[in-house]
Amino acid sequence: MDDNKRPLYLPFAGPAILEAPLINKGSAFTEEERIFFNLEGLLPHVIETIEEQASRAYDQYKNFSNDLDKHIYLRNIQDTNETLYYRLVQNHITEMMPIIYTPTVGMACERFSKDYRRNRGLFISYANKDRIDDILNNSTRQKVKIIVVTDGERILGLGDQGIGGMGIPIGKLSLYTSCGGISPAYTLPVTLDVGTDNPHLLEDPMYMGMRSPRIGGEEYKEFVEAFMQAVNRRWPDALIQFEDFAQKNAMPLLERYKDQYCCFNDDIQGTAAVTVGSLLAACKAAKSKLSEQRITFLGAGSAGCGIAEAIVAQMVSEGISEAQARKQVFMVDRWGMLQSNMPNLLPFQQKLAQQCDDLTNWDNFSDNISLLDVVNNAKPTVLIGVSGAPGLFTEEIIKAMHSHCPRPIVFPLSNPTSRVEATPKDILHWTQGKALVATGSPFEPVVIDDTTYEIAQCNNSYIFPGIGLGVLASGAKRVSDAMLMASSRALAECSPLAIDGEGSLLPKLEDIHLVSKRIAFAVARVAIEEGHALPTTKELLTYAIEDNFWTAEYRSYKRTAF
């Protein structure tokens, strides 16, 4: 029997039920439940359906005039009645995703301490480093299967937000549920409070985190190690997603733990997977291969390099050598294009630096090759922005790219909207509507000469919920590169533009449940093939995915002995 249809036996009654967001039904408690659980008189007389509740909640939602207030309102529903919250969000997913996650969640993180209302998740401070096991045991969620953890140091494009970064794990897990069907009872947001280097927070009397500079070095490594070991003791089968760690920690933590635990870094691997999936869809629409493209990145941090490495892997899978694939990828950061003779390149940047001997025929060859120089010399067909710096895809650069590429692929992916390298409207106007555009944050459709262009949001929410569902359904013990590549290919197969020759580059968010299930199946199949999960048939795997897919419906309650 579907878990949603089984009665749930509860050992408590009265107001305590109304204070438990995973259990509370509000006005939807039946007459029998109100009697058995001592709720008579605590609720208005009328018994409502969840759709009636959602209709009222949506009317209230529309009365708020700004996005931050809407975010706070939705979070209040989440903290009082999670089933209603997810029914409401799922009914209006396209409208509400930018409110519960990017870009609005960035403002919520900045105001986290000022707007704090109710506890959610776990805050593990360095001061309590010797009591992490006890803290995990204090969690209100007992059967945790997915954890999203941050240390708040690199929140979107906003930098160090300290414990305010908790808004990101909360938002991400909301998408695991609303997009990927993961029961909210299985999710846990965690913030590692290691201090902050943000002077505004240190001086803010309302800041609720540790008011001390961030720890680093061996102290930091030992603290994260203690956390990972404690989680493995408490929930050995849980999937751990690293979120918004600073560049200096993100890649080292991923490299350290990816072969020890079931974990991944969404900023590096999730962003890479959705970008590769979007590129594969764009290439299909243009009737070409990814291995035929010349790709330029603006931004050579851990996220940009993670995307680049995933692109190289996909190119190699299409039949070209790794050396040739790397020659077709050009990384530009604040110091110019990465070159092999540059000092102080980070380990993950070194493999993506262009060999100086290959650049001697370039115009303006120097130690500092600008983005425009790269566009004019390398003649890229794909331009990807992960710089976090607004306006750097200028009209001159886009037009220079378009002059040698009839249908350029341009992905300004930086979040939030205020950090985007160029707006879709500008890119499409500068290319007379020829560019294939996807962005990291949501944008309205663009109209040029009576033609409407839907702007695909190259958002990780297309990928990570499906990965989580696939891991849960298969029981996978690791998240491998091949599993991530499978998620990219599955996403590309869902592209309306690639399939039908028209429409958006990525599926509509209204279809996200179907997309997540398709990705989950692809991810789980590879997990089984690689030995990360036990063998099963396609039919049983499909059943497991459906069985693990939670829907926002109320269960009936029965009272058990105290």
From Swiss-Prot:
The keyword Metal-binding applies. Pfam families: malic, Malic_M. This is NAD-dependent malic enzyme. The lineage of its organism: Bacteria, Pseudomonadati, Pseudomonadota, Gammaproteobacteria, Alteromonadales. It comes from Shewanella halifaxensis (strain HAW-EB4). The gene is maeA. GO terms for biological process: malate metabolic process. One of its GO terms (cellular component) is cytosol. It comes from the Bacteria. The record marks 267 as: Important for activity. Divalent metal cations. Prefers magnesium or manganese.
